[in-house]
Amino acid sequence: MRIAAGLHPHNAKYWGPETEERLRAMLHDKRTSCLGEIGLDYHYDLSPREDQERAFRAQVRIAKEAGLPVMLHIREAHDDALAIMRDEGWPEAGCILHCFTNDWGTLEPWIDAGCSVTFGGALTFNNGDAIRDAAARVPEMQLMVETDSPYMAPKPLRGEACEPAMAVFTESALADVRGAEGEERLALFRRVLTNAESMLNRPPTAWQLGK
């Protein structure tokens, strides 16, 4: 079991010295392998957008200092988030665009920047053609799947509380949209697992070890 810790954009209005101190303490835990979810959410706007940007920028800087990858929650804000990442600089440890549900035109500049992307149950939905088209185009080395638990259960389990075991349905749909069959299908499953392990099942960083 590994840990991701970060201040979600919904709660960005609470960013301040005390919150940063608590986050840094969590990141020093050697089980922590990622800083996230962080980013921008313009759909709900539960925190003012200026607070979202302030917290986002601060946490990207901390991730770079700590040598950890970032996991990004971006909703209806991909252009602004991309501009911020370009301005702050991409963490060398990597970047994961969490639970992508948009089209290839939105995703392409993130892929070009080297960001990995995860697809959840929405990949299986009837109205998910644009998501499937995007998933078919992503280079294999940048692909992952996830659950977004407890939300977004994939077909045929829509309406249930999502759980990690359900990722197999999303992974199967991913193989389908990429036309992978037989050994190619198994190789894709192995690659998706390897991508996740290499990014998230990482040894402690020098920063975490106090070096």
Question: Can you annotate each of these PLM segments?
Answer:
Residues I62, A167-K211:
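Mid-to-C-terminal alpha-helical segments outside catalytic/metal-binding sites
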Residues R31, E65, D87-A93, A113, ...:
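Short helix-capping segments at alpha-helix termini
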Residues M141-E163:
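Short acidic/histidine-rich active-site segments
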Residues I3, E37, A63, H98, ...:
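Conserved, mostly hydrophobic/aromatic
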Residues M1-P69, A113-S116, G121-N126:
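Active-site gating/metal-coordination segments in enzymes
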Residues C34, V70, C95, L143-V145:
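Residue-level marker for buried hydrophobic side chains located in beta-strands
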Residues G16, L23-R24, I74-G89, I96-L97, ...:
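Distinct, well-ordered alpha-helical segments
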Residues H10-A12, D41-H43, R75-L82, T101-E108, ...:
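Active-site environment of divalent metal-dependent phosphoester hydrolases
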